[in-house]
Amino acid sequence: MPLSNRSTLTQYLIEERRRFPGASGELNALILDVSLACKAIARAVAFGELGDALGDAAAMPTGGAVNVQGEVQKKLDVLSNEVFIRRNEWSGSLAGMASEEMETPYQIPGQYPRGKYLLVFDPLDGSSNIDVNVSVGSIFSILRAPQDVIDSGRDVTEADFLQPGAAQVAAGYALYGPTTMLMLTVGNGVAGFTLNPTLGEFMLTHANVTVPADTREFAINASNARFWEPPVKRYVDECLAGATGPRGKDFNMRWIASMVAEAHRILMRGGVFMYPRDTKDASKPGRLRLLYEANPIGMLMEQAGGRASTGRQPMLGVKPTSLHQRIGLVFGSKNEVERIERYHHEPVTREFATPLFAERSLFRD
């Protein structure tokens, strides 16, 4: 499509707003501020070592080394978090923010007006890959603040953010790869925008994104196989058995270790992603964070006709219990996710209680 015929992100949001004549435009303004933050991060990522942005945050003058998750921070983690805060705190759209990189909610400074939305984000997902030039991204979720927060203007608390994924009013991610893309839902399907570096604008390039219901691809970190629960072992075992196994078809396995990149591949061509609950660490019933990773990706998948789940229940129905709560996550092509859910609810047979890489392993020589 010629450039002149493509909508900008701003035009797209205006068209969406027209569906609701009483809308104030405050949500549109917030999404545009988020997109501006993503543009700034995309530029920093693109410069890499030339911009002195690679390496651990411990080398920065401001210090920083380990975040609230106990993870070593990269320079770009710290920079990206700061960009999100500075680009979004001033506009009057937000009552507060929460981030993977901050232990407690961020209060909007007193010199700025406060609004009716909450912004939750992972400023740089997959940052462990940044030093080896693998695609990374930013994930965000927008919630409506509780009415008493809006009415009183009080400081937000952790409890204000503990809303199920179904309460999200918008969600999306930016992918910093060969091109920078923004995938967005405002509750009316999923649209994809590509950053035009000449104009500095996100242009609509993927309208009405749909995840195929069936697939021949799955993504999982097979190094954790010994910790998987039996339903996950069963599913992977059957996929690996290929055309001669119970599924009657061959599957490909993918693993990038960057959830934004995995989610983008699935939105573009289908597939299923699994980072399930396992027995590796009993204190962590999952690896990914519910509020700013699982929920926004889950909303995108559901809006694109896919499915997101814990493996046992729909992801968007989970009631959060803490700001940085971890959870098992399965998302992608609807029929595959539903199969995995079904396996979790069926009785465990002795056959699939056997570790995948033990004597029955399909990897056995």
Swiss-Prot record:
The keyword Protease does not apply. Its cofactor is Mg(2+). One of its GO terms (biological process) is fructose 1,6-bisphosphate metabolic process. GO terms for molecular function: fructose 1,6-bisphosphate 1-phosphatase activity; magnesium ion binding. One of its GO terms (cellular component) is cytosol. It is found in: Cytoplasm. InterPro entries: FBPase_C_dom (IPR044015), FBPase_class-1 (IPR000146), FBPase_N (IPR033391), FBPtase (IPR028343), Fructose_bisphosphatase_AS (IPR020548). It comes from the Bacteria. Mg(2+) 1 binds at E100, D122, L124. Binds 2 magnesium ions per subunit. It catalyses: beta-D-fructose 1,6-bisphosphate + H2O = beta-D-fructose 6-phosphate + phosphate. Homotetramer. This is Fructose-1,6-bisphosphatase class 1 2. It comes from Leptothrix cholodnii (strain ATCC 51168 / LMG 8142 / SP-6).
